[in-house]
Amino acid sequence: QIDTDWKLGFVGRNGRGKTTFLNLLLGKYEYSGKILSSVQFDYFPYPVSDKNRITEDILQEVCPLAEEWELMRELSYLDVDVDVLWRPFETLSNGEQTKVLLAALFLNEGHFLLIDEPTNHLDAKARKSVATYLKKKKGFILVSHDRRFLDDCVDHILSINRANIEVQSGNFSSWMSNFERQQEFELALNERLQKDIRRLQQSAKRAAVWSERVE
């Protein structure tokens, strides 16, 4: 069970099914069982079909109920000049495109964001700006290979493991510390079991030899 106020970092090795999981939430795949949700899921990056259009027109498509002043407020939080609203979307830098789409998606009340690798086209300054912005928001799942970025803006970690999916409170560093501790415990347990197996095998051999001698 996931609280819709959480800021969730989503981690797991490549190929473990992170993208598949997001697509299940978005209703793109058929599945057995039930996914119960009180919110609508939105995906980032939002697909912009015609980048020649004016940015404000695109953002009104993303968040049709938002007022212009609300967009301007969100852009100010992300250190983006509001004049981007009246420029063709394709003239914005990759970082500006990332920021304006995130700002618009967060204006959809009652929606839960699935944010997939938002830092791919961001420089260090823009990453810090987006991390600060996300830290003040709530209600999202964030997929990122940037560990520092995850540490800066999440309060829970959702992890896909070999045998299960689990949720832990904390940021990426605390999750990694717990994960490594668990790995060390399992390794030590396995080594102890192997020693016990070898000891029992040796005992069985000695018993067999003793039995043969008695006979």
Segments predicted by a language model, with ranges:
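ABC ATP-binding cassette signature C-motif
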Residues: 1-191
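Flexible nucleotide-interacting loop at or near the entrance of a catalytic core
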Residues: 1, 184-215
